[in-house]
Regions:
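Amphipathic alpha-helical coiled-coil segments
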Residues: 88-102
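Extended, low-complexity amphipathic alpha-helical repeat segments
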Residues: 99-160
């Protein structure tokens, strides 16, 4: 896992601290929501790592293809599809890293304020709902990338 030194969001100290603070203040449902969001971000990071590996394999296979007209057409189509997918993966990776940073900074802010002002400050945990909306948007972006890739694969299969 190459994203941010491979540390999962669920293992971040500030996230653990926030979860503990929420549980101590009988806010188990909010703690579960925060943990669910963090787990989802961790899962997205793993999927992006898998995409990276698949794209690398795809690129290596394209390089190994033989030289003839039909294969060259398929090779060109595959290369274009691979480039589009790689661009999409980079965009998604960037979005996930932004969300991860947002989760960490929101958690730190809520924890710091919770320590200073007590339980009422912990209700700011509702800010995580905005992050959840962003994650749902990223999920739609991933689904779009999958559909585009499936179409590219189908087109390439027709060439072969």
């Amino acid at each position: 896992m190459d994203m941010e030194a491979g540390k999962t969001l669920t293992n971040e100290e500030v996230i653990r601290e926030l979860l503990e603070l929420l549980k101590k203040n009988a806010m188990k449902e909010q703690a579960n929501d925060v943990f669910e969001i963090c787990s989802y971000v961790d899962g997205l990071e793993k999927k992006i790592d898998s995409m990276t590996e698949e794209l690398t394999n795809m690129q290596n296979q394209i390089k190994e293809m033989q030289e003839d007209t039909l294969v060259n057409n398929a090779k060109k189509a595959l290369s274009e599809a691979q480039e589009r997918l790689n661009t999409r993966r980079e965009q998604i990776k960037s979005q996930v890293l932004e969300v991860k940073a947002q989760v960490k900074s929101t958690a730190k802010s809520v924890v710091d304020e919770g320590k200073a002002k007590g339980r009422t400050a912990l209700y700011r945990v509702s800010e995580f709902l905005g992050i959840k909306k962003r994650l749902l948007d990223i999920r739609e972006n991933v689904r779009g990338a999958i559909k585009t890739t499936d179409k590219d694969i189908a087109k390439t299969a027709l060439l072969a």
